[in-house]
């Protein structure tokens, strides 16, 4: 490939990258209603709450901290999709969305397996946010708390009609 062709390809790529910035996804942080939150329905020890909000809250809450690179396409598309998927699966700030008590209980139990197997937080998040990685003691605390729901009746502490 000659130099002129390389320059043309690079220019076309640059123009493409600039043009795709027009198509930005909606990065939202819905209003938080405390009575709908997980903490209003499930007893959460302070150390577990701290670990969950710090290491999981960007995708599993309505209080996402959108970093600068989440405003640059195509990364913005991927990050927004990850956050929306995380919120759909389990949103700590909209616990009442898990209207089925068994589903809510199962999600709590699954937390331990996800963090032990390093499925959560995802690898890409852990790489970019080294300071937000779960520490060994936090994983132990999360698992002890999460697994306590195995012996509790489904939906313990969960009440869809909670005020």
Language-model features: locations:
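Hydrophobic membrane-insertion alpha-helices, especially the h-region
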Residues: 8-24
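A charge-rich, low-complexity, intrinsically flexible signal that marks solvent-exposed coils, linkers
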Residues: 29-33, 115, 153
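Electrostatic cytochrome c docking/interface patches
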Residues: 31-52
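The canonical Cys-X-X-Cys-His
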Residues: 52-64, 120, 142
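Acidic helix-start/capping segments at beta-turn-to-alpha-helix junctions
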Residues: 66-81
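Extracytoplasmic electron-transfer domains, predominantly the class I c-type cytochrome c fold
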Residues: 77-128
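C-terminal capping alpha-helices of c-type cytochrome domains
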Residues: 117-120, 126-157
């Amino acid at each position: 490939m000659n130099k002129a062709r390389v320059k043309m390809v690079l220019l076309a790529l640059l123009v493409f990258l600039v043009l795709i910035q027009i198509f930005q996804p909606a990065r939202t942080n819905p209003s938080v209603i405390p009575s709908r939150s997980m903490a209003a329905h499930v007893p959460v020890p302070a150390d577990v709450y701290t670990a969950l909000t710090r290491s999981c809250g960007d995708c599993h809450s309505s209080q996402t901290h959108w970093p600068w690179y989440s405003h640059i396409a195509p990364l913005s598309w991927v990050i927004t999709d990850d956050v929306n998927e995380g919120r759909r699966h389990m949103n700590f700030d909209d616990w009442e969305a898990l209207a089925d008590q068994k589903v809510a209980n199962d999600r709590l139990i699954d937390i331990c397996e996800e963090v032990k197997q390093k499925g959560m937080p995802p690898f890409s998040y852990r790489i970019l946010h080294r300071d937000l990685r779960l520490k060994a003691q936090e994983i132990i605390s999360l698992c002890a708390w999460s697994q306590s729901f195995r012996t509790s009746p489904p939906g313990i502490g969960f009440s869809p009609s909670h005020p």
